[in-house]
UniProtKB/Swiss-Prot annotation:
Residues 712-805 form the FDX-ACB domain. Coiled coil: none annotated. Disulfide bonds: none annotated. This is Phenylalanine--tRNA ligase beta subunit. Its main location: cytoplasm. The gene is pheT. It is found in: Cytoplasm. Transmembrane segments: none annotated. Binds 2 magnesium ions per tetramer. InterPro entries: aa-tRNA-synth_II/BPL/LPL, B3/B4_tRNA-bd, DNA-bd_dom_put_sf, Fdx_antiC-bd, Fdx_antiC-bd_sf, NA-bd_OB-fold, Phe-tRNA-ligase_IIc_bsu, Phe-tRNA-ligase_IIc_bsu_bact.
Amino acid sequence: MFVSYRWLQEYVDIKDVTAQELADKITKSGIEVEGVEVLNKGVKGVVVGHVLECEKHPEADKLSKCLIDIGEEEPVQIICGAANIAKGLKVPVAKVGAVLPGNFKIKKAKLRGEASHGMVCALQELGIDGKLVSKEYADGIFIFPSDAEVGADALEILNLHDEVLELGLTPNRADCLNMLGVAYEVAAIYGREVKLPAIDLQETAEKTSDYISVSVEAKEENPLYIAKMVKNVKIGPSPMWMQTRLMAAGIRPISNVVDITNYILMEYGQPLHAFDYDKLGSKEIVVRLAKEGEKIETLDDQERTLQSHHLVITNGTKALAVAGVMGGADSEVTNETVNVLIESAYFAGQTVRRTSKDLGLRSESSARFEKGIDPTRTFEAIQHAAALMAKYAGGEALEGVVEADNLQVQERTVSVTAEKVNRVLGTNISASEMGTMFTNLKFPFTEVEGTFHVNVPARRPDITISEDLVEEVGRLYGYDHIPVTLPSGTMTRGKLTSAQTKRRKVRRFLEGAGLYEAITYSLTSADKAKQYMVEPNEKAPVGLALPMSEERSQLRLSLVPQLLEAVSYNVARKNDSVALYEVGSIFLPTEEGELPKEEQHLAGVMTGLALHHAWQGEKKVVDFFVVKGVLEGLFDVLGVANQITYAPAKREGMHPGRTADIVLDGEVIGFIGQLHPEAEKQLDVKNTFVFELSLVKVFGADAEETYYAAIPRFPSMTRDMAVVVTKETKAGEMKQVIAEAGGELLKDVTLFDLYEGEKMEEGKKSLAFSMTYFDAERTLTDEEVTEAHNRVLTTVEEKFGAELRK
């Protein structure tokens, strides 16, 4: 919010306070002032000049030779290149010796052989942002009204001696999104009165109700709608003082009627809209919800497609405006407009916010409706606008208004005790001082034995509970005046949640296993969003309404595609061995219009060498079993290893013979495998393995407790076994059968070799297991181990048809 220091003085007497002092005081009261801008930017020596003569430069077609009266004894000759310079105009002139922004000094000069004693200025050359200059003067010099005094200070007329405070408002302080709201705040800080705008409205005998009727079908979305007619307006520029105030507020002047609606917006915080009455197409206004797919061309010349929850202003059939967001081009006020219908309404903030978001269209009006406006100002604002249009546009304000009023403004009373205020703030403020503060805030109240019952004005929707009143007292008392004290009360130790602890375990283990953590974008393209999903999902991924690019337009449903991008990027730069993991969220679509369900996943990608420089050993290439071993170690750390199984699977984008689902207690929670050769070809990578699983489901499983035991006093015995089985036999399933058959003496089973080669029969493979036998109470005899081992051999022969390799 940009606040003009001079404009603010119309509502609060602060002439004894500098703009910088005011900024410091406002900041200390709880509203941050992000900066104070001096509008003149060091400019001096610019006056109003009257063009007495203007003729073409004899040596240059695009230059004009002008004789200009600048209020001195003799007029001066100035060469000007502006296309809109002409005899009789009053223009800003930088005299010789003047200083313009950037410390640019004006000197006597010769342009194509002709002397030039000064410079005729455009507003941009005086330091005004080009975005705030009206279209009429965007490409030329500025022209003052004909009654401007020759030789007068041009900066004074342009209000460039003003200073502007930029307020960094938090969402709860929407009451300060207008000049009156800021005035109430400043008046409370300094204990002064607020001078409300005087409305001098002269109405004709004709009635607004003779020209228009109003009905509201969507009463919940639009509880209050007021309309008023102003006839016979003459479209032209708004008065100079209004234009300069709007520019100081960051709004570009357009015309008197439009500027007046914007001026009221900045003064009251009440959005208004002006319709060209003669373009309405009927004598009725109907406020309703849009029809699905209904279209309207808005003031920014864009055709918008509406949805059934959008609120529109119609003429009974056709949409004229998107309520609270932007008007329609068909009923826009133009230079030919004669009769104006003014709209002042209270639209539900939630409706406006959703419409604005859907259409990707934000405006000054929508920003205020979203955060909440004061419904008690709706009538006053439209009356003031009509008075200004009558005065500055030559219009005739018709008697009365037409309205559809279903609004019930309930009085809010919030109570707080002086004891609570002092206890919370750590102060010793008397009840009478608190009463003075509430009076300065213009909060009516009654006090009964130290308890304040405060009637909260409608302009302050942020005051709802007693703590809000405590904050108000603290702000006005001054946070810098509150005594410094040490914290008191019971202190508790912070701790990590179970999920946080487990996530740290995951990161530590994977980094210890040689993987590097990556953090990738949560946004991806539409074609990648549904790749490599753990669970199939028929619903469309959640997309952004206004994506920066198609590559970042959808919320991801898997972590793998983004990790593969990172691997492909590295491999393309000769970094062939890459091992990455990511702990991040995926976003599962729910019902239409609802927020997606966010779920934590773990994913990893490995390619190239698993061991780069093994000491006195061979380099090891990443394969399925390397990646599976990493996951098995992770599950062991998390205490769920015995609950995890693997099942062969076929997944899109994955190698059909080297992919497995990760199953936890019968439920598929993830997958592991090698990329499909076609996918590897597209990414230009080789032998790349991936995995992804749901951490939510892993963390939710019952983890096995960790037990500690003394170091064994008795030796263990190891036996190896290599068996030939069919290729369909699952090593994991056989391992489980071996563990059960070995009984209590068999403490560990490890698969250490898998062989499928030329020496094997067709459809056969060799699995080699190492088995460790141990008893903590005694030394096992060879006969006991042989008995248990033979039992294992017999079992695998019977269950799997295994043959012992010799």
